Amino acid sequence: MATISSIDSLRPLTIGLIAGETSGDILGAGLIRALKAKVPNARFVGVAGPLMQAEGCEAWYEMEELAVMGIVEVLGRLPRLLKIRKDLTTRFTELKPDVFVGIDAPDFNITLEGRLKQRGIRTIHYVSPSVWAWRQKRVFKIGKATDMVLAFLPFEKAFYDKFNVPCRFIGHTMADAMPLQPNKATARELLGILPESVCLALLPGSRHSEVEMLSADFLKTAQLLKRNIPDLHVFVPLVNAKRREQFERIKQEVAPELNVHLVDGKAREIMIASDAALLASGTAALECMLAKCPMVVGYRMKPLTFWLAKRLVKTPYVSLPNLLSGEELVKELLQEKCQPQKLADELLPLLQGSEKVGALKQTFLHLHKSIRCNADEQAAQAVLELAGK
């Protein structure tokens, strides 16, 4: 007669996963692929997007159920979100997966991870929240809720180490996806840019508030640069039709005569093709560094938001290239310093190929290598170790 333990030993490796947005779906799919390569009969179940489902993850709920942004939207959906979390707690407790992996979505996942850990289920939080930058006390909640944090960046691991929270630096999936030496000629050919053209990328952000706050200053900066470089080509990749419409309206008000190339998507190709970029901070700055494109970061927010941020944020820089290097590798012009003349003064030498550009690209390459560690594989290894496999 089979015992419970012998039945358990026959059960395939079972991994619970929750992804709450598209970026998490991409990470989840990569993790599932890497795990299936090692354990072909493994079972994956939880909240998944289309990419994770295509890799064989069984979806108890669709990812869109969790993908809500903004306080008003979250409040409107709160009863449903709480009901889903309660149901998931019950179902995962009954299933007892070998490991539960919460992918990003910290406000939803970390509480759930804590409940599952209390019930004897091993938990991983994949993608560190920015606890090193602000609301640092969250690290204690994360430490109680998880057996392991998987971090993209080395300074994140250093932060968790200070608080004795188990953390593994796995490198960044974007660094894995992008070549160490991007092909500028190919990118220019794709975009129809001549090899000898001088090219500037403007990336005023992906959120409505960013495009509203930054576009006018960015366009005025391009106008100033055109005085020095009359044949300057200006490319603006926009994430969707709404942001394009918004940017076009602002351009019509601020710089109707300025000739710019508006492109749907293709931000990465534009970064690779460009001689310099002016961008909002965020993931775009990391992507631009990996594209080996010199950049200036310009950022504005509402005065009260900035006042609060200055008091809450504990880091000397806002952009990832600077946080990775521990110095102001990339010029950051924030709030009242984010004005066209100052931005243009910083960008002009980059566009003209000053001596600084070669050294900057070498540093970008060094930083790229430091976070290019095959993150999917590293994440899979961490899951298997925690599962005792």
Curated annotation (Swiss-Prot):
It holds the Pfam family LpxB. GO terms for cellular component: membrane. The keyword Lipid metabolism applies. GO terms for molecular function: lipid-A-disaccharide synthase activity; phospholipid binding. The keyword Lipid metabolism applies. Pathway: Glycolipid biosynthesis; lipid IV(A) biosynthesis; lipid IV(A) from (3R)-3-hydroxytetradecanoyl-[acyl-carrier-protein] and UDP-N-acetyl-alpha-D-glucosamine: step 5/6. Condensation of UDP-2,3-diacylglucosamine and 2,3-diacylglucosamine-1-phosphate to form lipid A disaccharide, a precursor of lipid A, a phosphorylated glycolipid that anchors the lipopolysaccharide to the outer membrane of the cell. This is Lipid-A-disaccharide synthase. The lineage of its organism: Bacteria, Pseudomonadati, Pseudomonadota, Gammaproteobacteria, Enterobacterales. The gene is lpxB.
